[in-house]
Curated annotation (Swiss-Prot):
Compartment(s): Cell membrane
Protein name from the UniProt record: ATP synthase epsilon chain
UniProt-listed InterPro entries: ATP_F1_dsu/esu_C_sf (IPR036794), ATP_synth_F1_dsu/esu (IPR001469), ATP_synth_F1_dsu/esu_N (IPR020546), ATP_synth_F1_esu_C (IPR020547), ATPsynth_dsu/esu_N (IPR036771)
Gene (name only): atpC
Similarity annotation: Belongs to the ATPase epsilon chain family.
Functional summary from the UniProt entry: Produces ATP from ADP in the presence of a proton gradient across the membrane.
Annotated membrane topology: Peripheral membrane protein
Source species: Bacillus pumilus (strain SAFR-032)
One cellular component (GO) term of this entry: proton-transporting ATP synthase complex
Length: 131
């Protein structure tokens, strides 16, 4: 099967680079499955897991929003933050989840949106880490 080169980059530098058979991302417009030869496009991403399929296995990378740029033989994901499943600090993600839930249980108008986003990021990281 043909492959597409994937690069996931954050402001801190590259997080993931490999040739894969398929990339799946959660764009603002919905789920996108990208194969080699895909039509060029750019789409904003939601907080979610990027699924990278190759050699019969699937790798997960947690991304906190950003953009995906698709070219026929290359996919570049520019994310505000990204972590591969083996790099997720599970204890830190659980603590962030707990703090966000506490803020949501005792809401202050200015904190609600921030707490919702923090909770989504923490749950995404835990999902990618398989916890």
């Amino acid at each position: 099967m043909k492959t597409v080169q994937v690069n996931i980059v954050t402001p801190d530098g590259p997080v993931y680079q490999a040739d894969v058979e398929m990339v799946s991302v959660r764009a603002e417009s919905g789920e996108l499955g990208i194969l080699a030869g895909h039509v060029p496009m750019v789409a904003p991403l939601k907080i979610g897991a990027v699924r990278l399929k190759h050699s019969g296995s699937t790798e997960l990378v947690a991304v906190s929003g950003g953009f995906v740029e698709v070219r026929p033989e290359q996919v570049t994901i520019l994310a505000q933050a990204a972590e591969t499943s083996d790099k997720v600090d599970v204890d830190r993600a659980k603590s962030a989840k707990q703090r966000a839930e506490e803020h949501l249980n005792h809401p202050n108008e200015s904190d609600v949106r921030r707490a919702e986003l923090a909770l989504k990021r923490a749950l995404n990281r835990l999902n990618v880490a398989g916890k």
